[in-house]
């Protein structure tokens, strides 16, 4: 049976706004990422989660807006660049984390993961 989830990491995401470590636990984190896409009329989404220093997902420490709003930047032309904005996130516990940003495109029968990246952050009390 074919899976509706496939991964193709061709276009890298460019992080244009990210937190500067160290940050205090509970402080608002803003992240902006740009991604070049071939289909400007597609339906795109991005999601954030927290990983520990070993790359294992840590549930419950990253709070707030974990799904990004997005907008096209050049009017729907081919080779569009879209911008994902995470404006209201925070990490509730001190420690060393990676914030993983994953971008997806909705397709018939599911979603395709387009790319992912991580941002290292040190969180203090």
Features from the language model and the residues they span:
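Beta-strand-rich extracellular modules
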Residues: 102-106
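N-terminal onset of structured domains
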Residues: 1-56, 63-67, 77-78, 87-94, ...
